[in-house]
Amino acid sequence: MIRMGGRKMNPNNRSEYDTIKVTPNSELPTNHNQYPLADNPNSTLEELNYKEFLRMTADNSTEVLDSSTVKDAVGTGISVVGQILGVVGVPFAGALTSFYQSFLNAIWPSDADPWKAFMAQVEVLIDKKIEEYAKSKALAELQGLQNNFEDYVNALDSWKKAPVNLRSRRSQDRIRELFSQAESHFRNSMPSFAVSKFEVLFLPTYAQAANTHLLLLKDAQVFGEEWGYSSEDIAEFYQRQLKLTQQYTDHCVNWYNVGLNSLRGSTYDAWVKFNRFRREMTLTVLDLIVLFPFYDVRLYSKGVKTELTRDIFTDPIFTLNALQEYGPTFSSIENSIRKPHLFDYLRGIEFHTRLRPGYSGKDSFNYWSGNYVETRPSIGSNDTITSPFYGDKSIEPIQKLSFDGQKVYRTIANTDIAAFPDGKIYFGVTKVDFSQYDDQKNETSTQTYDSKRYNGYLGAQDSIDQLPPETTDEPLEKAYSHQLNYAECFLMQDRRGTIPFFTWTHRSVDFFNTIDAEKITQLPVVKAYALSSGASIIEGPGFTGGNLLFLKESSNSIAKFKVTLNSAALLQRYRVRIRYASTTNLRLFVQNSNNDFLVIYINKTMNIDGDLTYQTFDFATSNSNMGFSGDTNDFIIGAESFVSNEKIYIDKIEFIPVQ
C-alpha cells in the first residue's frame, strides 16, 4: 500500500492519536519520605486512601521522556520508512514527483521541524546536549538542502509534465543544473551532521539526510540520459551512489552501536534507557538504512516487495517510579529476551493471575503474574511453539486469549498499587486491551485480559505512544506501524510485583510469504519454517532489517520454505538471487517442489576474522529460472560441502520475475 499522506499534526504539534493520553509515570514527591505513610506516623491507611496517595504521587509526576518531542521524531521516522516501502523500485519513477512532494511534507513540513525533533530526541535519550554552534550550523545546512531539493523537485515536475517534443535545451540544462546543485550541496553538507563528539546525537539527522541524498542520486540513473548527461557522467554518479551507500550505512551502524553500548548498565532504569535508545534508533535510523540498496536501479530494475522482520520492545508496563529500585537487573532482562530465531507469529497468550492483598484486606487487587506464549512458525508448518513460563504461576483461574490470524496493532494496559503502613508498595497490571485486525476479513475487534479485581487506577500504558501509526490519514487499524509478536514478564525484587513487556514487529511482515508476479520479492531467510542442524539464526548487523542464517556445515537442505502465489504469479518464472556474506567460495542450490534445480555460485566476500559490514555482503544469482505449480509451493536451499571453519551468512532470497 502506498501511503502518501504523511503525519497530520494537531494545533499543539501533536499527532491526533496523542489525544489518547496515558497517565504520566508517577513518582513520590521529593519533599516527602519515599513512603508517604512514614511521613506522619499518626496517619492511617484509612485516612490516606488510594486517591489521596495518587494525588500526592502525582504532585511531582514527570515523564521520563518528553513525549511530544519523542513522538514527533519517531512518528516522522516511521512515516518516512512506510512511504518508501510502498514505492521502492523503478516503477515509482512514474509517480516520483508526487512521492517527493509527500516525502518533503514529512521531513520538511510547514507546521513543524522534525530535524530539531530528531536532535532533541537523542539529547533526551542519552542525556547530553549538542553544542549550539554545531546545532545552528546543521540547521542552517538543512535549510539550504530543503531549498535546493524543493527547487529540483519543482523542476522535475515541470520536466515530466512537458510533452517530449516540447522539452527545450534550456529546460534540459536547467534541470541538470538544479540536480547538480542539490547533489553537491548534500555531499558537502553531510560532514555537518557528523561533527566530532556529536556523531551519536546527530545520528537520526545524518540518516535522514543521507537517505534524501541517495534518493536524489538515484535519479541520475533514471533520468540522466534524457537530461542530456553522457554515459560517463551517469556512470560516475552511479559509482558515487554505491560508495556513499556503503559509507552512510557503515557510519549509521557504527555510531548506533557506540551510542547503545554507552548506555549499558546494571540497573532496571539503565535497561529502560538502553532499550528506548535501541527502539527509537531502530525506527529513525536502522529501518531507514535497510532501504538504501533499493535505490540502486541497476540492481532493482523492477518494483520491490520487502519486509522488516526485526523485533523491537516497548517499555515494560511499569508506571511507578518509586519502585524502580525493585525492578529486575539490566542483565536479567537482557538475558531473558529471546535469542535470534526463525520468524514466528503470535498465536495466543495464557495469562496467570495472582491476588495482591492490601492492608487489612483493603486496596487488594488481582494482577498479571505470569504467562505462556504460543507462536506458530512461518507458513509451511502447523506446529505450535510454547514458550517457557515467564513470571509467577497462579492458583487463580487462567485466562487464554487466541490471536491466530489476527494482527494485534495496539495494547492499552492498566496498572494498580497496594500501599502498607510500613511504607511498602506493591504493583501490578490489572487489565490489558488488545486491539486486533483481521486483514483477510477487514474486521476489527478487541480482546481483553481482565484480572477482575481492581483497587483503583494508577495509570495506563498505550503502545501507540511509543509506536505511532504510519499516517493519521487512515483509521488506526489500517495505519498502524507495528503488530504484537510476543509477551514476557519479569519478577520484581522483594516480591513487589510482576512487570510485563511486549515485543513487536513491523507491519510489512507478510504472514503468507507471498511471491509477487511483477515485483522483485525479497524473502528474509528467517521466514523459513525449518532449519537443518548445521544452520542457525544469529543477530543481524543492523542494516539488514532482521537476523541472518549462519551456516556452519553443508547440508542438502539448509532451510525449508513455503510460499504463496496467486494465479498470475503461478504463470511467471523467476530468477533467484541471494544476498550473502562468506569467507569461502561455495556452491548453493535451490530446489522447489516442481523439481526445478538452480545452482548459485557464491564468492568469498570477507576474511575469517572480519566483521559483518555493508561491504562484506554481495549478491549471487541462479544460472536458470524456476516456477511454481500451485499444488505444493515449497522450496529448499542446500549447500555443497565446505571446510568447517568457514563462515557463510545468508540474509535474503529474492525472486525476480523474468517474463
Curated annotation (Swiss-Prot):
Domain of life (superkingdom): Bacteria
Leftover remarks: Toxic segment of the protein is located in the N-terminus.
Polar residues bias: start-end ranges: 22-41
Alphabetized GO MF terms: signaling receptor binding; toxin activity
Name listed for the protein in its UniProt record: Pesticidal crystal protein Cry3Ba
Family to which this protein belongs: Belongs to the delta endotoxin family.
Disordered: annotated segments: 1-41
Keywords from the UniProt entry: Sporulation, Toxin, Virulence
Biological process according to GO: sporulation resulting in formation of a cellular spore; symbiont-mediated killing of host cell
Signal peptide start and end residues: none
Function noted in UniProt: Promotes colloidosmotic lysis by binding to the midgut epithelial cells of Coleoptera.
Gene3D superfamilies: Galactose-binding domain-like, Pesticidal crystal protein, central domain, Pesticidal crystal protein, N-terminal domain
Cystine residue pairs: none
